[in-house]
Amino acid sequence: MTTIQLAVPEEASSRIRLGADLLKRSLLDIGLTIHEIGALTLAEYRNIAGIKLVIGNRLDHAFIRELEEHEVLLYHTNAPEGEGFYLASLPGNLIVIAGGSDTGVLYGCQELATIIAEKGGLPQELAFGDAPDMKLRGPVVPLQLTKVEPPRRTYEYPITPGRFPWFYDRALWLEYLDRLLEYRCNVVYIWTGHPFSSLVRLDSYPEAMEVTEAEFEQNVDTFRWLAEECDRRGIWLVLKFYNIHIPLPFAEKHKLDLHQPKPLPITSDYYIQSISTFIRTFPNVGLMVCLGEALQGALYGVEWFNETILVGVNEGLKDLKLKELPPIIVRAHAIPSEKVMEAAIPNYGNLFTEAKYNGESLTTFTPRGNWQDTHQHLSSLGSIHLFNVHILANLEPFRFGAPSFIQKCVQAAKYRLGCNGIHLYPLFYWDWPYSPDSVTPRLKQLERDWIWFAAWFRYAWKPDHHPALEREYWIGQFAKRYGSREAGEAVLDAYEESGECAPKLLRRFGITEGNRQTMSLGMTMSQLTNPDRYGPWKELWESQAPQGERLNLYVEREVRGEPHIGETPLDIADNVDAHAKNAERAIERARPYVVQNMEEFERIAIDVKAIALMTRSYTFKARAAIQILTYKLLSGQEFLNHVELLEAAIPAFEESLHNYRELAKLTDETYLYANSMQTPQRKVPFPDGEKFGHWRDCLPHYEQEFHSFTARVKELRNGDLPGGVASEERVGTYAQAEFVLHSSDAQTYVVDKQSKLFSDGNVLASNVAEELVGLTGIRINRDQASKEGVSIDIELKEPSRILVGYFNSKDSEWLQVPSLEENTHADDRGGLSPVIKNGLKVFFYPSVNVHAFLYEPGRHTLVFGQGSYLIVGVIKATQKMTVRDLEGASSLDTLDWLYENGKA
């Protein structure tokens, strides 16, 4: 029996020892014996009989350095650095695994162990070097739940066994971490709202702890163990937190809101102490910082990050002697992070930036526009820049595993965006670790979506494998799972074809790439033909899609006989229909050859069918929408003209509904829900992600929509204008609510034509909507608001809506409407969409849209952010408000009355 003489450094780190264990296991599996020996030298290693296997970090391994210096060990690739490694067979029966770091040694041992397992023996000739292209590579693990826990808000969940039993399951973690090592991940990002109240105890702020003493001890023990297990696999554990979030009991004691928009001395001190204590307790854990959403990052991001967060980090590190500084990652989310990084880079030596890839969906491998500019700028700042594959709201809840699409996305991140690291969300984020399949026991996402993780991390290591070789690789991976090459090839084809559908559908027809849209649940005809009503996010088609046309632009060009530019709605409809059909054929082609894992194969087949039905429900509805929009253009407001176009829309509209019915039926027993975020933040197709979380919940509304449409078309064909169309309702002034203005630097005024709108300057209203005339508005200082932001102290006597006017301009002097794409809490008080578009005209300035935000009785400090705005009234919350536009399209022109019970 052959004996391998294995030389492991006596002072080897846990990473190198783990690599040695992987090697030992592979050698024992092929029947070899292992004898561990001490350090070798160039002069004496030949005196030891048999095969010698030496592993070590070339930076501090004396024998490897000696081999290099005497040119016995030469590299035909780059000499290994960092996580790189080199495998070499050398004279005298010597095999060397040289790593550029301890992690490089681990990966080299892993590589040789894999070769041994595949070949069934030690290769005679070895000369192979490898290193990752991307600096950080890893997945997100969320400590989040699908529903909010009032009075806490979104993201806020203390870490307890009752909320997250899986977090304490060490066997589950070990399985997960071993898989990440298999994929050569070197980071795992744990996402929370405010973790410090569950992981650190502060003598100065005992009220900040949100868990019991027993839970705290369990948390610290679990987290320390987890950090150590990550470290021995070469994985950084990174903890994410939002700013400025504070613990509920801390907020209650100090009478503060849970989410703070600007730094206060007490919140800054609390964070400095929390972070420094955390660093001392868990020295090998990094931090990921979200400076947007609650914090007004444009105003206070630089101050908060540099004067609070980095102060806390450096305070925690000052007495520690670490070989590597923990990574600190700054999210470029709802904040111009360039200024933050410019100030921070001199203050810390291991900084990263991160930004979303395709927003909160997956839409294209050719990102462009503003978002491309943002990535490229961040990647030029001198720190490492990561791309974040985030939420995947358009892929939920189905399986996605199109390796060629994923490979091109990673290449785009590298070459188009300048990224050098990946931050990967699971496919069903909010319900981790479970998948949404209706299966008992519930499936784990790590197993169900194995190809999702495997493909992204394969290409994060090396993006540029040849496509033909990659096809063979993935056929082999599927063949192992389903028992034959024929099955592997066909299942791969099904994944590739079905994987094209959701990205293309969303980028051409969607309202947003943000997580307020659950794409698999469909879209209403109003959302397709009148998207402005639903706050469309233009970055979807201007940054996260190839050049092309939205439905309305396509119809306008078609009617005018103008040439089309880029991909059109009909291009995409025909294209994804073909992809869906090809996927259905491929999965059936696989069926006779599947000899193992039949249950999972059948679940994949159901997903392929579901994606095809979803696709056809979109494409036929889009074809109907083209007819309806053509009617809108040609008829003007002569609604009895060109009714034949509406009639022509009915067959496609009905076919869309038929496919949706089949989809609801198919998923009724196979899926628990469609969307992992079951909160009011989900708005499209219907408000409230909990109430409308399944296709069966949405189907009655789509049935009613089609019924209303056919009824309206019949009335129009008979020469009758539906009720509400013949005459629009008159509007009157809103009912004012009583309030007290406590701010000394603001003034009340009566809203009317010629009213002075700001306390400084002479900005006057030239026209005012009837609803607003006579209301009591509040004047602020325009210059101060545009440069610094202002706060308004107001006391309400009853439930009220505060009417905020946003100027229709993207110039930085004007406050911008909050968006759910950038702030999950943007619609907590309603008012995300305007109630009166162009409700005020202002001499020499842009027109003003009026939004209505709901507030409870009591005293409030209004802090909306940097930029000038108007407050044009405080009204009773109970009254009905009719949405309308004083300029351009009226509520009739939108044609929503065609689908919504005939009401304008």
Regions from the language model: what does each represent?
Residues 28, 42-43, 166, 186, ...:
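Catalytic-core regions of glycoside hydrolase
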Residues 37-74:
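Short, well-ordered secondary-structure micro-motifs within conserved domains or adaptor modules
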Residues 426, 430, 438-687, 691-694, ...:
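C-terminal non-catalytic alpha-helical accessory regions
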Residues 798-810:
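A short beta-strand element within beta-rich, extracytoplasmic domains
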